[in-house]
């Protein structure tokens, strides 16, 4: 059975238009989920809305949406007023520009979607746009309306299809200066940096997501299985922290001595999903945030 499309519409480049479909590239179906239950009965609990001041139960027709102007002061927004500012989808992905891949700052990347042609008649136009981007190593920046909100989406070739990733707006990112300005000047030597470089070489590898292991998820499933079968659960003893103080140079030397993995050759080509933050674009965005 074909996966259900999240969005259907057209991809538009100037006068070239082709029908496309979007599918979410991520899923949380396999994640272990817990529900709140009554310990005495084992029944699932349901949540109710309670007035924070009076403690009274609030029914569905009494609930509204309010924006907090000041502490405890809200302006209520009616549903029809919200609808007035929502953007109706025109079911078109309008490509505004094509940018070099390396200029895209990773911090702006948000939700990924797979983009495929919708029907046989769309394949040729879809392939022309896809292959042109591949040849020039550029990423399309376009606009799309999802759930009544307009988003900027970055579109790039991926195999036979394309990958679209919605981008955050500058106001959604915090300025790194808030966190980095107080970092003091380091007292390190060239030898320390070279030793660290050798350690890096012993751990050099290729990017292989298939080797990622979610140890917490695995442990959760094992815990649930043991608990459901009535087996006792043994809690681990807390680890004692070592009180030994080791100098940075000694730690580097000891780490290098433990390195038993040979350095892997550097990848000949950067993977499409892995992008280096663009300093130029980032500085520009930071200036915009400060100016705002």
Curated annotation (Swiss-Prot):
Under CDD domains, the record lists: KU_like
- Keyword DNA-binding listed? The answer is yes
Q: Which residues form the Ku domain?
A: 12-196
Q: Where is this region: Disordered?
A: 231-292
Q: Domain of life, per the record?
A: Bacteria
InterPro entries tied to this protein: Ku70/Ku80_beta-barrel_dom, Prok_Ku, SPOC-like_C_dom_sf
Q: Where is the composition biased (Basic residues)?
A: 271-292
UniProt GO MF annotations: double-stranded DNA binding
Identify the keywords attached in UniProt to this record, alphabetized. DNA damage, DNA recombination, DNA repair, DNA-binding
Q: Please provide an example of a Pfam family that matches this protein in its UniProt record.
A: Ku
The record lists the membrane-crossing segments as none
Task: State the disulfide connectivity.
Answer: none
Tell me which family the UniProt entry assigns to this protein: Belongs to the prokaryotic Ku family.
Q: What does this protein do?
A: With LigD forms a non-homologous end joining (NHEJ) DNA repair enzyme, which repairs dsDNA breaks with reduced fidelity. Binds linear dsDNA with 5'- and 3'- overhangs but not closed circular dsDNA nor ssDNA. Recruits and stimulates the ligase activity of LigD.
PANTHER family cross-referenced by the UniProt entry: NON-HOMOLOGOUS END JOINING PROTEIN KU
Summary of subunit composition and partner proteins: Homodimer. Interacts with LigD.
- Write the protein's name: Non-homologous end joining protein Ku
**Organism annotation:** Bradyrhizobium sp. (strain ORS 278)
Q: Which gene encodes it?
A: ku
């Amino acid at each position: 059975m074909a996966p259900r499309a999240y969005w259907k519409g057209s991809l538009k480049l100037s006068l070239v238009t082709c029908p496309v479909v979007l599918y979410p590239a991520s899923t949380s179906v396999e994640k272990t989920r817990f529900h709140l239950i009554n310990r005495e009965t084992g029944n699932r609990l349901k949540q109710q809305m309670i007035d924070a001041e009076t403690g009274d139960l609030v029914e569905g027709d009494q609930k509204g949406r309010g924006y907090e102007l000041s502490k405890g002061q809200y302006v209520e927004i009616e549903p029809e007023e919200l609808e007035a500012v929502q953007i109706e989808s025109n079911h078109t992905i309008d490509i505004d520009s094509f940018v070099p891949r390396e200029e895209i700052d990773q911090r702006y990347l948000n939700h990924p979607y797979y983009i495929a042609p919708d029907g046989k008649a769309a394949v040729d136009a879809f392939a022309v746009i896809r292959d042109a981007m591949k040849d020039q190593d550029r990423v399309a920046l376009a606009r799309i309306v999802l759930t009544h909100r307009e988003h900027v989406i970055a579109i790039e070739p991926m195999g036979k299809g394309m990958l679209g990733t919605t981008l955050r707006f500058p106001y959604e990112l915090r300025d790194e200066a808030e966190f980095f300005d107080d970092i003091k000047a380091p007292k390190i030597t060239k030898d320390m940096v070279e030793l660290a470089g050798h350690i890096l070489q012993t751990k050099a590898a290729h990017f292989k997501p298939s080797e990622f292991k979610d140890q917490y998820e695995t442990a959760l499933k094992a815990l649930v299985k043991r608990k459901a079968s009535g087996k006792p659960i043994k809690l681990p003893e807390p680890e004692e922290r070592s009180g030994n103080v080791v100098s940075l140079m000694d730690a580097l030397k000891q780490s290098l001595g433990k390195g038993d993995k040979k350095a892997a050759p550097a990848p000949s080509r950067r993977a499409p999903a892995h992008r280096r933050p663009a300093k130029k674009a980032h500085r520009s965005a930071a200036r915009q945030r400060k100016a705002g």
